[in-house]
């Protein structure tokens, strides 16, 4: 056996001068990147005033302080006295707490699925699988991908019963009972070996458990997320209620989209209900973190690897996709498992890992079409590893590679074949003009969310101007990636090893391609763990070659993690109150929903009183709780929403309700500043329905038919009756409570060119906004666009201006300044009901006011 020294040796065994020069040059490059990154971070915080935004609700901040105090009281004594018990105690307490909060069935259902998936994946990987925690995570994701495949077909058949899935999940466990015992013993042994000897290791482990505990607490809350209640929880609930999925693309526009994650949620939902689905999502995060930790251990000692895993877990986006049922945790875990299988192929030459990578890639594509760039970029690396072990793969390696490609196609294609068979569009509802479907007007094109140019500013903007890339607050992307991305690219110059190279190319390349197509920050979530891996490699290099740089990177990591923790709720609007105070209380879920999502309780009341009756959700997409026939006035039911928009007279609206057999309506209570689209629908509901139940701003009403043949009576305009108080100098967004809206207005957070991404708009004549201020000048901010009309401006009851907001091209944050005598004043902006001949509408919007 020969040993090949990787470096030329000079006198006394010292590296040659050229090698030293290269190391020094690379160290200087890393130092320059760190210095530039820190400077950009400081500039971003100063320019963006991020700490001035309302990240936490007051009660949320109090709960965070309580959580920190409780964690320290519990963790510090354990860390000092018996640190080897810390991991086991944390897992035990989490298990007991989960059972108390969600009931025993939910965690048992998730545990059954995970053990079954791990057993199935381990059997597929061979008789001598890797029983380490990252190895078991890989096997679990492989088994999950296998379960996703048949569920694509079974979901549409009436075979989905709890007993059926309990038996199906039990089969791999029974067939591999010895392996299950061995893996459980290996897990127990791993816990015993987590001794946390050094203080650095203890601190890193504590940080990881701390932030995972925060995600666990929000995962225990009832679902309140719009996407989940409209689709990702609705699918499991529908399947459990009818034993098959009854959603069809003729009405539900998303009914044939990729649903790999939803199939996993559906399996556990049948056994443990909603809580099981949410816990399965959290379990996918744990699996992802375990694999990321395993990848970091290739270059780092345990303390630093734990810190890298914790850094990813602190990313605010993690709380967004873990605190509500999104698909991103499942997708990211499948993608990282695919990459881990490719690495194992390179290390072992075992063709089973090639097949595993293919199945995992197919599972990722079945979960989200956005996985395509990740899979495409991974294929060359899998091919390279197969080429390196060409003779070892099998006696017929070419056939083996063809089988792998067929496995990928076979596991990925069914979702898109079903979509094509049902709609004539494999990507329905997108690309409708290229693949015309009978369910959409051929001129319609469903637009995706955000479209920002990808350039050298993108990384800075997505970090500090996150509102342009996500319906969230600035700073919600995570502060580490401004450093990680350039460090990962720089690492390609000096870090040896294909794992770091493949992770960097696939992660950063897929993120670039995705942002060019749709710059929604959530869509590159699956690339973030991959981008973290080459950073771990760079960190490992500095540990060996520059301790000063290593300590600087560790310090940056800790600071970024701390900032991320503070900004965790910035990634959405659902968890700014942190955990629910009723988590462990009897009927705590309903008590939480009373103020967080009262429409869910109104829908339950409808289910109890009118099972089987058809209901229209007038301004909501929460169909997860509906057990009868449901229509939505939203883009999720595109044709329904279009039909309602076109029904501008009573006979047409009444005809729709008769055609759909709608007898009940759930709608928000009419109030000042809240608009129901189209406005005629509000008039119809006010005149033609009778109130039956009201809770938390939502009403259940019965269609009476009393106004049949009559035009709806006009309803007095709702007026904001809150007392007005003059505000001082500053900029006030349209969502600020200092603004008082009268009449029907619609508020949106999804306008990327607007101030803070928010706009409030209406075309109702007479509707207005009042704003009291104390100053010498006030500026009205608005948007000029193709469908704008005139806005009449009055100050202290005196007419000041009539502004034409029309422009053939959108002009964001347009301004009109008015000077007044110093002191308190009130400005009013009202919809004039007039427009220029070229305008397509008479809309008026409010983007904010600036007081001087």
Feature annotation, model-predicted:
Residues 193-201, 297-300, 304, 349-352, ...:
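Membrane-interface helix-loop-helix junctions at transmembrane boundaries of multi-pass membrane enzymes
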Residues 125, 338-353, 388, 539:
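Membrane-interface transmembrane helices that cradle and orient dolichyl/undecaprenyl
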Residues 201-208, 352-359, 375-379, 397-409, ...:
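Signature aromatic-anchored transmembrane alpha helix within multi-pass, membrane-resident enzymes
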Residues 70-81, 209, 287-293, 383, ...:
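Hydrophobic, aromatic-rich transmembrane alpha-helices
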Residues 223-234, 553, 557-605, 621-623:
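Membrane-proximal, lumen/periplasm-facing interface regions of secretory-pathway glyco-
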Residues 2-192, 514, 653-654:
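Membrane-embedded, hydrophobic transmembrane alpha-helices
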């Amino acid at each position: 056996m020969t040993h090949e020294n990787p470096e030329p040796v000079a006198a006394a065994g010292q590296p040659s001068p050229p090698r030293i020069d290269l190391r020094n040059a690379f160290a200087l490059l890393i130092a320059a990147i760190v210095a530039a990154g820190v400077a950009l971070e400081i500039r971003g915080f100063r320019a963006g005033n991020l700490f001035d935004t309302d990240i936490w609700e007051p009660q949320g901040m109090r709960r965070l302080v309580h959580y920190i105090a409780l964690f320290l009281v519990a963790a510090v004594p354990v860390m000092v006295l018996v640190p080897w018990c810390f991991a086991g105690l944390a897992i035990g307490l989490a298990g007991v707490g989960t059972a108390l909060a969600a009931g025993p069935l939910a965690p048992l259902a998730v545990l059954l699925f995970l053990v079954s998936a791990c057993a199935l994946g381990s059997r597929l990987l061979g008789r001598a699988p890797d029983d380490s925690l990252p190895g078991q995570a890989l096997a679990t994701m492989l088994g999950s991908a296998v379960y996703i495949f048949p569920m694509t077909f079974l979901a549409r058949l009436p075979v989905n019963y709890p007993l059926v899935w309990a038996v199906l999940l039990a089969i791999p466990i029974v067939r591999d009972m010895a392996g299950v015992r061995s893996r459980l013993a290996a897990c127990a042994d791993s816990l015993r070996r987590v001794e946390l000897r050094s203080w650095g290791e203890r601190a890193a482990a504590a940080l990881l458990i701390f932030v995972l505990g925060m995600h666990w607490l929000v995962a225990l809350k009832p679902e309140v997320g719009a996407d989940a209640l409209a689709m990702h929880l609705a699918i499991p609930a529908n399947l459990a209620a009818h034993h098959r999925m009854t959603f069809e693309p003729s009405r539900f526009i998303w009914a044939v989209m990729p649903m790999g994650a939803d199939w996993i949620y559906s399996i556990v939902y049948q056994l443990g209900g909603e809580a099981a689905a949410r816990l399965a999502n959290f379990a996918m995060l744990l699996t992802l973190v375990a694999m990321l930790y395993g990848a970091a251990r290739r270059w780092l000692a345990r303390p630093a690897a734990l810190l890298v895993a914790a850094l990813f877990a602190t990313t605010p986006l993690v709380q967004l996709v873990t605190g509500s049922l999104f698909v991103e945790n499942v997708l990211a875990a499948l993608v990282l498992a695919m990459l881990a299988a490719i690495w194992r192929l390179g290390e072992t030459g075992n063709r089973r890992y090639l097949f595993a990578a293919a199945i995992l890639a197919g599972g990722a594509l079945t979960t989200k079409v956005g996985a395509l760039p990740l899979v495409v970029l991974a294929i060359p690396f899998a091919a390279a590893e197969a080429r390196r072990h060409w003779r070892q793969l099998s006696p017929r390696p070419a056939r083996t590679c063809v089988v792998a490609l067929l496995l990928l196609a076979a596991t990925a294609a069914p979702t898109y074949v079903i979509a094509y068979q049902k709609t004539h569009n494999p990507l329905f509802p997108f690309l409708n003009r290229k693949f015309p479907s009978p369910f959409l007007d051929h001129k319609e094109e469903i637009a995706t969310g955000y479209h920002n140019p990808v350039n050298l500013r993108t990384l800075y903007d997505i970090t500090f101007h996150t509102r342009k890339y996500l319906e969230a607050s600035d700073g919600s992307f995570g502060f580490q990636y401004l450093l990680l991305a350039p460090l990962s690219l720089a690492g390609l110059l000096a870090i040896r090893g294909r794992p770091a190279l493949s992770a960097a190319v696939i992660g950063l390349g897929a993120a670039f391609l995705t942002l060019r197509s749709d710059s929604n920050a959530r869509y590159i979530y699956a690339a973030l763990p991959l981008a973290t891996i080459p950073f771990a490699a760079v960190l490992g290099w500095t540990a060996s070659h520059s301790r000063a740089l290593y300590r600087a990177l560790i310090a940056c990591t800790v600071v970024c993690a701390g900032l991320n923790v503070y900004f965790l709720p910035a990634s959405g609007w659902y968890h700014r109150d942190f955990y629910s105070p009723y988590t462990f209380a009897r009927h705590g879920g309903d008590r939480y929903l009373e103020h967080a999502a009262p429409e869910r309780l109104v829908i339950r009341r409808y289910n109890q009183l009118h099972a089987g009756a058809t209901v229209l959700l007038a301004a909501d997409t929460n169909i997860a709780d509906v057990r009868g026939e449901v229509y939505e006035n939203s883009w999720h039911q595109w044709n329904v929403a279009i039909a309602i928009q076109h029904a501008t007279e009573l006979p047409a609206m009444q005809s729709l309700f008769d055609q759909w057999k709608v007898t009940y309506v759930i709608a928000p209570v009419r109030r000042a500043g809240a608009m129901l689209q189209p406005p005629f629908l509000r008039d119809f509901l006010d005149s033609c329905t009778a109130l039956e139940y009201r809770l938390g701003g939502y009403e259940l009403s019965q269609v009476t038919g009393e106004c049949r043949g009559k035009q709806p009576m006009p309803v007095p305009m709702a007026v904001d009756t809150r007392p007005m108080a003059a505000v001082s100098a500053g900029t006030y967004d349209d969502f600020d409570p200092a603004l008082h809206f009268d009449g029907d207005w619609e508020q949106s957070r999804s306008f990327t060119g607007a101030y803070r991404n928010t706009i409030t708009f209406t075309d109702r004549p007479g509707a207005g906004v009042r704003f009291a201020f104390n100053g010498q000048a006030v500026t009205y901010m608005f948007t000029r666009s193709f469908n704008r009309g005139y806005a009449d401006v009055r100050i202290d009851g005196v007419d000041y201006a009539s502004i034409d907001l029309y422009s053939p091209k959108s002009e964001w944050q347009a301004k009109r300044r008015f000077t007044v005598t110093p002191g308190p004043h009130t400005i009013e902006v009202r919809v004039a009901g007039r427009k220029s001949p070229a305008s397509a509408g008479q809309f008026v919007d409010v983007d904010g006011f600036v007081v001087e």
